[in-house]
Structure formats: C-alpha cells, structure tokens
Regions:
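N-terminal helix-rich module
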Residues: 2, 6-7, 11-14, 25, ...
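Conserved polar catalytic motif of the HATPase_c/GHKL fold
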Residues: 22
C-alpha cells in the first residue's frame, strides 16, 4: 500500500546542494513537476499543476536558508532572466524539477561585503561551485 501524501524531504538543516538533490528525488518519486520558489528568507517547493506553473494549494515543503543567510542572493534562470531575491512573496518558480531527474537549471550568486560565491544547477541536476559563469 502506497501513501502518496508522504513527503520524503526531511526537516533537518541542509546545504542548498542537498536540498536540490532531495527535491529532484521527490519529483521522481511523485512523478510530478515540482517548482522551487525562493525569497531572501525562505525557500518553498510546490507541485506544479500545469504548464502555466500554477501552484497547487500550500507548499509541499518550506524552509529557511541554512547557508548564505547573511548574503545577497541573485539567480539567473535558464532562459537568461536575472533576479535579485527580496522579501517579496514567493510568486514564481525559479527552477522546475522534472520526474525524469532533469531540471530547468539556474545560476546563483551569493555575496556580501567580503565574499562572493557562484554556483550552477545543471539541467542534469548537478550543483557545482564555479568561479566564472
């Protein structure tokens, strides 16, 4: 007997890489497209209802930033749109996770006065630290 309401994402603090790995696994298990939403305070995962990225009710999972809490956060989506995260509502998914294990991918920049980190989430789901985009 399978309970489709089981959420496999744990509540323990993790790195962003671990979060993305769990979201990818959750999408595969559910057989559904999942959207990753974020602002400066939190990240949330929603099941995507259709191609219009309409969300279904409340988030599957919501969590605070474990890493980079004191950093400005910028995301460049796979279609080249750039966003600086703010405290605004979580109104659009920056990344989609597909049941095939693939993602739409994104580039991330986290920075403050002293440090800057660049990462990329590949279409294949790998999360890599990079020096230059």
């Amino acid at each position: 007997l399978l309970n489709i309401n089981i959420v496999n994402i744990s509540n323990l603090p993790k790195t962003l890489e671990e979060n993305f790995s769990e979201i990818s696994q959750e999408s595969i298990i559910r057989g559904k497209v999942l959207g990753w939403y974020a602002n400066t305070n939190e990240q949330a995962i929603y099941e995507i209802a259709n191609e219009e990225t309409e969300i279904i009710s409340k988030p599957i999972y919501s969590y605070t930033w474990n890493e980079f809490t004191e950093f400005e956060k910028e995301i460049e989506t796979s279609d080249g749109l750039k966003f600086k995260l703010s405290n605004d509502d979580l109104d659009l998914p920056y990344i989609l996770f597909y049941p095939s294990g693939e993602t739409t991918g994104a580039k991330f920049t986290f920075y403050n006065n002293n440090q800057k980190y660049n990462f990329v989430l590949t279409h294949g789901g790998e999360f890599l630290r990079i020096d230059e985009f």
